[in-house]
Regions:
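Active-site-proximal beta-strand elements of phosphoester/diester hydrolases
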Residues: 198-202, 315-316, 355-359
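Catalytic beta-strand/loop cores that center a nucleophilic Ser/Cys/Thr
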Residues: 310-352, 388
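Residue-level structural signal for beta-strand termini and adjacent loop
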Residues: 25-27, 64, 318, 349, ...
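Short, flexible hinge/linker loops that cap or flank conserved catalytic cores
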Residues: 191-195, 266, 348
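RNA-binding accessory domains that recognize and position tRNA/RNA substrates
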Residues: 1-236, 248, 364-366, 376-388
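Cysteine-nucleophile active-site neighborhood
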Residues: 240-325, 366-384
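Proline-centered loop/turn at the N-terminus of a beta-strand
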Residues: 114, 198, 271-273, 289, ...
Length: 388
């Protein structure tokens, strides 16, 4: 809830331009600095905080009631929260949900993540929209003592996400196999036993639900680190290559990811499917360029138009960089665009089963309009296999 008049604040959010927000702290104590973004999703705060794509970012939730259903281990998209911090309008109260295994504040505290509640998130969101994703410092001190000048200085000293390869910080340390499928009532998560295709997934910060969707589409998934080479990929003799989501500047990650993708394209006709950062990696490998967005797209209600069918899909998005559609080379077709700002949301090669999308078809959280893309990937592998 907002601070009562006379109540001492226990958290402070300082923007690089000197704007200060005071509120009630929860989660871990300390100070962190990062890029500040906002997310418009009404549900899925746990999935958002554990999405590796949020590395280097403090997330402002525009929906006022966050934490109401608590937390549980099934909703983690990776082992621990990756987002640097959390900003909400109302600090969490006692959770109420049959799946809840704990409180949001305790969960954040045990995982070293700072949060602030009781501030005007509408004002903050407007500031983010107007100024672009600002750099910020977030502090939580139960004593209520803050060196505001030092916090502003820390916000100003944050290097930003441009030029940062964050995929290397969130990728897996070694390869592993994934066979867990999507959650379904009443059994929950089940194991895949009848795979049709072998798929290598490159982990630039892969969400668990993406891997579940691949498994549910009949893929026997082997996950490799972001630094995997073309030789590493081809050694598994896969039927398809998947490029995952992830954080940071695609141009920085592309320094080692792009040569791998280009070599795979040269040496194999296997289908390739990319999501989010994987979409940007594929675009760079095909000769396009990426650009930093003003405040990015973060939410679960983003309309995207499929240019092939004219269909509009409501999607989940989480990206601060975008593919510049004006730089797409001949032979690469733009397939999807955002209906918010016209930015690129999908590409495919004209003569090969190679495609990618900027949005998140796996949702988690969000709508399921784009689940068909996983089946499209599986179908493309079926066609290649039958042609051999």
């Amino acid at each position: 809830m907002p601070l009562i008049q006379g109540q001492k604040p226990t958290a402070c959010l300082a923007l690089a331009d000197g704007t200060i927000f005071y509120g009630k702290g929860f989660g871990a104590t300390g100070v962190t600095e990062a890029e500040l973004c906002f997310n418009t999703a009404m549900t899925g705060y746990q999935e958002i905080m554990t999405d590796p794509s949020y590395a280097g970012q403090i997330v402002t939730f525009t929906f006022p009631h966050i934490g109401n259903v608590g937390v549980n281990p099934e909703d983690d998209e990776t082992a621990n929260p990756v987002a640097a911090g959390m900003v909400v309008k109302w600090d969490p109260t006692e959770p109420s949900n049959y799946r809840s295994a704990g409180e949001l504040g305790d969960w954040l505290a045990s995982r070293g993540r700072i949060a602030i509640g009781g501030i005007d998130t509408r004002r903050l969101t407007r500031a983010i929209r107007a100024r672009g994703a600002p750099h910020a410092a977030l502090a939580h001190n139960p004593d209520g003592q803050f060196d505001v000048e030092a916090l502003v200085a820390r916000a100003r000293s944050f290097s930003g996400l441009v030029g940062l390869d964050l995929a290397k910080d969130v990728t897996c340390a070694q390869s592993y196999r994934w066979d867990e499928m999507r959650w379904a009532w009443p059994d929950g998560f089940t194991r895949q036993t009848e795979a049709r295709h072998k798929v290598v997934a490159i982990d630039y910060g892969a969400k668990r639900n993406i891997l579940r969707c691949l498994a549910s589409a009949g893929c026997d998934v082997t996950v490799l680190p972001a630094s995997a080479t073309a030789e590493d990929v081809l050694a598994h003799n896969p039927d398809g290559l998947f490029l995952s989501n992830g954080p940071g500047d695609p141009a920085a990650t592309g320094k080692y990811a792009v040569p791998m993708i280009q070599k795979v394209l040269e040496r194999s006709d296997m289908p390739i499917f990319g999501i989010c950062l994987g979409h940007q990696m594929l675009a760079l490998a095909l000769g396009a360029q990426t650009v930093k967005m003003n405040h990015g797209h973060h939410g679960a209600n983003h309309p995207v138009k499929d240019l092939d069918t004219g269909k509009v899909e409501i999607t989940s998005m989480n990206h601060g960089f975008a593919v510049d559609s004006q730089t797409l080379p001949a032979g690469v077709k733009e397939t999807h665009v955002s209906l918010f700002d016209g930015s690129n949301c999908g590409i495919r090669m004209a003569d090969r089963p190679v495609f990618s999308v900027q949005h998140h078809p796996e949702a988690s959280p969000g709508p399921q309009d784009s689940f068909y893309l996983f089946e499209r990937f599986a179908t493309s592998m079926d066609k290649v296999s039958s042609a051999v």
